[in-house]
Amino acid sequence: MTLYNADDYGITARQAENIRRCRGEGCLTGVSAMPNSPYLPEAMAAIAEDKTLCVAVHINLTEGLCLSKPSDVPLLAAADGRFYPSFTRLLRLSVTKPKALHTQLKREIAAQIDRVLPLLAGRGLRLDGHQHIQMIPAVLRAVRDVLSEKGLTAEYIRWSCEPLSPYLRHMALWRDYPPVNVVKNLVLNTLGLFSRRYMRDMGQKRGAVMGLVISGNLEYRLVSALLPDFERYAAKRQKTLELVMHPGWGVEPGEGLDAPGGIFEAFYKDPARRREYDCLMKL
């Protein structure tokens, strides 16, 4: 089974509408909703009747404003409530201040689940992470504890350990794999060695993902060439395959969750967002 997922759903009304077009006119089967977006209620209302669309809570600890009181989560956000935009900072704090971080992670993750849960319109709870932060062991541990304390069970949690073997089979495409993405892939796979115990605790089967090594370059030419190998990889291991994409074009400067001129603003206005949108329309 292959899931075609759009991350970052609901950052703006236009961005959410463009993602929904990938559902109505393309092959999209799931979205990951940004819990701290002011447009979340509107975006979720627009998909409330589409019961077969998978909807995940896109746990976000790096972009926009926290949902907790800023003074309650000082390791995660500045005094104005804006998240520190750093995966590596979270990773470092998980080593240097594990107890304080665990308390604050639980508080913010609980707040984000609480905001999205009533808007799921009867769907089961699904979880993943913005910038794949759920792969940090401390974050996944906090997710486990929040679910346990709330008496919740997730029907799916994304496992962002992407296999490299399907990429290596296509030597003609190697130049299309940004070296920094290969490094990120290896980092996430390494973190997975320490995080998988928490997946077991939650009764989660580790699935497969595609799209990390070519993140920012998920155009139809590459995806159509690589997807069959990823599907064979997943089928052989009886895993669900999730194609992770960001087709939400249309976020204008100053409209997103990030501060104007921030690192995420450049990502949303990148032409690659439109290419990923086009890819989902063609697959």
Regions of interest found by a model, annotated:
Residues 1-3, 13-126, 136-283:
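Terminal accessory/targeting
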